[in-house]
Amino acid sequence: MYSKLNYSHQKGDQALKHPHLVRLQQSEVRGFTDMPNNGASTSSAGSFARQDSLTIAASLQQRDRERHPVDFMETELDLGDYLQVLHDLDVPTDNVDFDDAELQKCNILYDGEHPYEQPELNGYERHVAYGTGYRVPGDYDQDGYKMNCEVKAETPDFGATKTRRAVKRPVPYDDYQKEYSEESSDMTDNDGSVDDSYFEPKSKKTKSAGLENFKPQTRARKYKLKADEEKAEPTYKLKRARNNDAVRKSRKKAKELQDKKEAEHDKMKRRIAELEGLLQSERDARRRDQDTLEQLLRNKGPMKEQRMPQRHILENFNK
């Protein structure tokens, strides 16, 4: 990495002593010594020679392009040189060159002041973060740098809110025009006497008009009345009797199936009630057994173990 530059006019530019830089200077790709003042931009004040990091970065990129002209974008770049150059600038904060070109650009862009509200910092934090050129917010008017982009809130006047409205049921298409001309013209949305959930019932006149104008969409089954002579024939009477018997038989069978289903349903209900009773009796028996056991355990005193002393046992054994 590159060593710090000497900003004193009394001493000359010291040679870069780092081994890595020596190797770079001996090779075809040299360091920044081929640039005037080691790549640093000089100002009219001449107090010190400040190294321009943008120029150094551009020169490094140009060197990389010369080494790898084909796959420059695909080549991995070592950012250590760029970062070290920025780290080695070491420009004293109390000796700023206000005539520098980069600083002049910043002054032109920001009009000499910061366009934002500066934070409240103590003396040490101001010196570390901004240097001696930091301005206290109380020294100037901060409101003069605020952007005037406030928009007045305009609330449209909708007038009185409509809480009620008339709702009509759909009517047949045939008498739609007639009903609309007679009844709907009297109803308006501004009518406050009608509730939202209220539906006006149709009048008898509307129902009668609907029945008169009704047109069936399906065709009826063709049926012709028999003549009196044909009804008097015995074959017709026999046919009608057989038909009536078949209808009665079908109805009787359907009724029997319905009765059977109802009987099975009642039987299942009784069975369910019986099982529920057995289950409840089982639960009651278990609860009674548990209560009995708990009562016995509470009434039973602690068992005292009567142990004979060891000496007494030996005496009995010797006898």
UniProtKB/Swiss-Prot annotation:
Sequence ranges assigned to domain bZIP in this UniProt record: 233-308
Superkingdom in the source lineage: Eukaryota
Subcellular location: Synapse; Cytoplasm; Nucleus; Cell projection, Axon
Known role: Transcription factor. Binds to promoter regions of target genes, perhaps at the motif 5'-[AGCT]TT[AGT][TC]GAAA[ACT]-3'. Modulates expression of genes involved in development and in stress responses, including those regulating the p38/MAPK signaling pathways such as MAPKK sek-1 and phosphatase vhp-1. Involved in innate immunity. Plays a role in repressing the response to infection by the Gram-negative bacterium P.aeruginosa, perhaps acting independently of the pmk-1 or pmk-3 p38/MAPK pathways. However, also plays a protective role in the response to infection by P.aeruginosa.
GO CC entries: axon; cytoplasm; nucleus; RNA polymerase II transcription regulator complex; synapse
Biased composition (Basic and acidic residues): 171-181, 225-248, 255-274, 281-291, 302-319
Region (Disordered) location: 163-319
Region Leucine-zipper, residue ranges: 275-308
Loss of function: phenotype: RNAi-mediated knockdown suppresses lifespan reduction caused by infection by the Gram-negative bacterium P.aeruginosa when combined with simultaneous knockdown of nipi-3. Knockdown reduces survival due to infection by the Gram-negative bacterium P.aeruginosa in a valine--tRNA ligase glp-4 mutant background.
Record flagged with keyword DNA-binding: yes
Residue numbers spanned by region N' domain: 53-67
Molecular function terms, GO-annotated: DNA-binding transcription factor activity, RNA polymerase II-specific; DNA-binding transcription factor binding; RNA polymerase II cis-regulatory region sequence-specific DNA binding
Name of the protein this chain belongs to: CCAAT/enhancer-binding protein homolog 1
Lineage: Eukaryota, Metazoa, Ecdysozoa, Nematoda, Chromadorea
GO BP terms: axon regeneration; defense response to Gram-negative bacterium; defense response to Gram-positive bacterium; DNA-templated transcription; lipid homeostasis; microtubule polymerization; positive regulation of axon extension involved in regeneration; positive regulation of formation of growth cone in injured axon
Keywords assigned: Cell projection, Cytoplasm, Developmental protein, DNA-binding, Nucleus, Synapse, Transcription, Transcription regulation
Expression across tissues: Expressed in touch and motor neurons.
Family recorded in the similarity comment: Belongs to the bZIP family. C/EBP subfamily.
Record text on subunit structure and interactions: May interact with transcription factor ets-4. May interact (via N-terminus) with nipi-3. May interact (via N-terminus) with importin subunit alpha ima-3.
Region annotated Basic motif, chain positions: 237-271
Extent of Acidic residues compositional bias: 182-198
Reported impact of residue 64 to N: In ju1521; Blocks injury-induced axon regrowth. Suppresses developmental arrest in a nipi-3 mutant background
Induction entry: In response to methylmercury.
Source organism of this protein record: Caenorhabditis elegans
